[in-house]
A protein has these predicted regions:
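Short, polar/flexible loop-turn hinges at active-site or ligand-entry regions and domain interfaces
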Residues: 4-12, 32, 82-85, 111, ...
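Preference for the N-terminal adenyl/adenosyl cofactor-binding alpha/beta module
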Residues: 11-250, 275, 279-285, 292, ...
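Nucleic-acid nuclease catalytic cores
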Residues: 1-4, 97
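SAM-dependent methyltransferase catalytic region
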Residues: 171, 185, 189-430
């Protein structure tokens, strides 16, 4: 046609065509992965899974056997009220990618989507339920192809070497978390900023942990600090458990130094696994954190059994809803998780609260519960013009911690926050 016309037709949809070519050629695997290149490859595929596959599945509402839509309904009804399809697609895609990553860290042999289920610890009930479908279920073809491809990337990568490289480069003692930061920055930096998801530097965590430990000893007469078996600890914005992992390590080392290794296993079982609590809203860091605690306790000679779990719950800290039980296949642990989290919020006495809550003035957290208890901080500033500043998530987390400590009457908080409350009149009530 071009020869007959003796002219070239005008270029149309050039950007879309280039984008298609980029996606096509980018799915070839490099021979050797660094942490950076692995994060990039996983991020590209996870973004594709979210935007081109899960989104499409969620729009197919006429398909009665659509399990992805069923999972969305279950998450919305039994875990995170008000969850949008867009947020679920993001949550679900990251869950699959990091669930595969978590499984891959537990084997040096051949790895695939179908084998992943065998390497998901039974203590992470929700993740185990998700992978019962991902690994063993009948997936939509386009979903199967992209998840198989993510598994192939992980199979080709030397995960142990990549994580060790973080140690060698002086990035600290938390390589899994540093890798997640790299992944998230490549995958969706905007969501990272909106959610206030940033890694907490280890020296800051050390400082706060040691400070709270001293306060427990001097002001609360807890001779062994965090190692006192009647001390309860909560991180309300657990993330990847940077704070509680350090606190647990600190407590175990203190206990061992003072009482020897003989009772250490029992100390971990009866104190660390019973009196340390955390909440997290995003499922990828939730999965990573469970993996991280399993590795940490393993370092101290404690192998987690099928009946053990660290008390980190997938929940919105600033929301308290009495949710009914679900019998949706593969989602049995979802309603149980919600139930356990609500019990901790309402009834579990907590003495020490530490963490790095999100900072976002455009807060997504507007539940009836948090808006009601924030009224206490607004009483003194009703005539202020800039009261919107009190809607920042970090202020709401401070109020939750305050409310939680009020249940007992005494307590200590060690939080990383913005400093706006120090010199802004809108925070007088706070």
């Amino acid at each position: 046609i071009a020869r007959k016309l003796k002219t070239l037709p005008p270029v149309e949809n050039e950007n879309e065509f280039r984008s298609l070519l980029d996606k096509f050629f980018s799915f070839s695997l490099p021979k050797v992965f660094s942490a950076e290149t692995l994060a990039i490859e996983l991020a590209k595929r996870t973004r594709f899974l979210k935007e081109e596959v899960i989104h499409q599945e969620l729009e197919d509402e006429e398909n009665n056997s659509n399990q992805v839509l069923g999972f969305y309904d279950a998450f919305q009804k039994y875990l995170i009220a008000g969850l949008t399809k867009e947020d679920f697609a993001d949550l679900y895609a990251q869950t699959i990618a990091y669930g595969l990553f978590a499984a891959r860290t537990r084997t040096d042999g051949e790895f695939s989507r179908r084998l992943a289920y065998n390497f998901i610890p039974p203590t992470i009930g929700i993740l185990k339920d998700v992978f019962q479908f991902i690994s063993l279920g009948s997936l939509p073809q386009q979903m199967e192809v992209i998840i198989d491809d993510i598994a192939a990337v992980l199979n080709a990568a030397d995960i142990s070497k990549i994580l060790q490289d973080y140690y060698k480069k002086g990035k600290g003692q938390d390589p899994i978390i540093h890798f997640y930061e790299t992944f998230l920055n490549k995958y969706d930096p905007k969501t990272r900023e909106q959610r206030g998801v940033y890694y907490t530097p280890e020296p800051v965590v050390d400082y706060i942990t040691h400070s709270v430990n001293e306060i427990l000893k001097t002001d609360f007469d807890k001779e062994d600090g965090f190692a006192n078996t009647d001390v309860t600890v909560l991180d309300p914005a657990g993330g990847t458990l940077t704070f509680l992992a350090q606190t647990a390590k600190f407590a175990i080392e203190d206990f061992t130094e003072k009482y020897g290794e003989g009772h250490r296993t029992n100390f971990i079982k009866e104190h660390i696994l019973k009196n340390f609590f955390a909440f997290e809203l995003m499922m990828a860091p939730y999965a990573i954190a469970h993996l991280k605690m399993s590795f940490l306790l393993d370092e101290f000679g404690y192998k987690m059994k099928d009946t053990d779990r660290f008390k980190l719950y997938l929940t919105n800290t600033l929301e308290i809803e009495d949710l009914e039980q679900t019998r949706i296949p593969g989602m049995a642990s979802l309603s149980e998780e919600s139930k356990q989290a609500t019990l901790v919020k309402r009834k579990q006495p907590i003495l020490a609260i530490m963490g790095n809550p999100p900072y976002s003035i455009a807060s997504y957290n507007k539940s009836v519960f948090i808006e009601e208890i924030m009224g206490l901080y607004k009483e003194d500033v009703k005539d202020e013009k800039n009261i919107q500043l009190l809607s920042d998530d970090y202020a709401k987390f401070i109020r939750f911690c305050h409310w939680k400590i009020e249940q007992v009457g005494v307590g200590v908080m060690g939080l990383i926050t913005k400093n706006t409350y120090l010199n802004t009149s809108a925070f007088k009530g706070l």
